[in-house]
Amino acid sequence: MPLPSRASSTPKISKACVPCRTRKIKCNAAVVGLPCGSCVSRECPDDCVLSARKRRTVKVRNAEAPRSRKNIPDTNGSVLSPRQQQLPTNVSRQTTDSSHSDPVEESIHASHTGSSLRNDTPHSRDRRPPGQAQADLLYLNILQDTVNDTSAAQTDASDHQSNDEPDDSFNSQIHHWNPPPQLDDVDNEYLAKKKVFELPPPRFMDDIVKAYFDYVHPFAPILNRTDFIQSYRLGTCCLFLLHAVAAAASLYVTHDVLLGCGYPDRSTAQASFFSKAKLFHDFHCQGDPLSMLQGSMILGAIILDHPSDRDFQYWFHNSVRRASKMGVQNACLRDDGSQKLYRRIWWVLHNRDIFHFFINTQNMRLLANAPPIRPLTEADWETEDIEQWSGILSPISQAQKVSLIAQCELAQIFGNVMSVVTSSTPSAEEIHKRILPLDAWRTSLPDRMQLMASFADGEIYHLEALTTSYRFECIMCRLLRRGRWQMSDGGLREWAQQRFRSAIFELDTIVKRVMINNTIQKLPTTFITTITALLALHIESALDAAESSLIRSMARISVQHTMLALDQIRDTPAIKRALPAFEIVLSKNKLYPTSSSDTEQINTMQAISQDQTLNDGHILQPAQADMTLPQDDQSFLYGDFIGFDFLDRWQMEQLDFTGIY
């Protein structure tokens, strides 16, 4: 029989072959010899080889090996070679044509588990390394603390013993006792059929990564850029993180790049990358703790063109859970190379926590009891040498750094406001006092961002910060004037009404400015979805019988301008999903022209509004305009439709605008 003879003619094998080790599946090479049954079934017998075993001392095994895994290996490193050279054929065959393949492409399309962060500082006895998740079970935490305390006591008595050796040894034993889940052949086959191991061709993937760092990363700098690019080039970057990056960047690449990746439009591309990242997450088969945290945070800022159970709230909760498990809040207090990255990560989570609660007070503050940390400064960005990566990375500008710092300050301001309005006895005087820093904050932004007189790239970060502030001021003032927090002070409601209208005017001006300068496609998702919130506010004013005819007519004009802005970004998945609902409401109430005669009438109304001052007695109204909302759509006026939850709770047949992220 062939199998026994093959086994007898080969040396004794005591470990799995390289493809099976990479895919983390059971290998029968020790029984049948090489090639093993798994490689034969996958039709890749030539790849079935054994990795060279390296001799190492006990000290290197226990201390140096875990540390080296946290570093990015160089091109000659032994960690990278098996993953680069032993690519499973069934995966590489599904990527790009072999004539276009190179070592970088092969390594990118392999299954990677490397970390993109360097963290080789000595361990603290009081805090775990930030890249290492704490044990899930209480008894393991107690045992680990005991080992650390014993190690510290022995070190005080004898200086020749290292502090981190016992800790690393114990941690490695914990991982040995609690091995990660292994994927079987069925799981691997399912993931392969879903094409989760595939990435776009390298030239298009480079465009995607560049778009991410140009348009997404500046507003949430949760990656170490140079470390990420190095691991991406070496092929050790986590595929979960890469798919998350691609999902976010798909909104900003050109149509030619989308076609080169095999996608007809942005919605299809984003949904595909999002689905692949979700599969990696669900199967627990990719990524170190830091990469999983970063990928979850990126997915938490994505809105698909269809409802999903894994909405932004899910990924935000998942991000907070992972950050707490990793001890990121403690890593912010460390004095080493990783501190800057972890401080930025924690502040981004902190900002989202406040904004989510501010939008919808039914949401719970997840980080309300977290210990305070120092505010961000411009020193919390790494000093980078990007000369060799100049084709992908651009220098970080002053405006980009100030943008995140300003967002943190804005979150603190609105956090203080919410602590007052949600208290048992809120007073108008206290609310006025807490909102005063907002005006000074806005005035200081141009000088801090070093903006030029003409419209430049730095203006994008200024306008995005202002947009966020006016958006949340609209939310607060709208709720105050509607009596959301049981406040009967008539003067406070009048004050809230004035600030609400001023904020609406500023948002209209900002939207028109980005349209004129043709930069609306460069702005982040938070700005894009603010436009839909602004449109909802204009619709509310146009249909509100309590408003004067002047306000209602001005709102109708603003509806046309806002719809024009949305039309420029209608290929964005979030807008593609929202437009049908708006068009139904606008069409039923004749707020949006559906014929050439309607368009001419709207243009005439806009021209008169620019030539003369309108008053309540001289208002042009569209013919047969119905100023009341039909009974079946009354829910439109009663919901909170400018929050974060709109597209993930919205049902087309209900037209219930409950918020938008």
UniProtKB/Swiss-Prot annotation:
UniProt protein name: Fusaric acid cluster transcription factor FUB12
Localization of this protein: Nucleus
Keywords (A to Z) from UniProt: DNA-binding, Metal-binding, Nucleus, Transcription, Transcription regulation, Zinc
Main localisation: nucleus
Region ranges (Disordered): 57-131, 151-184
Single Gene Ontology BP annotation: DNA-templated transcription
Ranges of compositional bias, category Basic and acidic residues: 99-109, 120-129
Practical application: Fusaric acid is phytotoxic to plants such as cotton and banana. It has been shown to induce programmed cell death in plants. In addition to a mild toxicity to animals, fusaric acid exhibits acanthamoebicidal, antioomycete, and antimycobacterial activities.
Example of a GO MF term: zinc ion binding
A GO term from the CC aspect: nucleus
CDD domains per UniProt: fungal_TF_MHR, GAL4
Biased composition regions of type Polar residues, renumbered to the chain: 73-98, 110-119
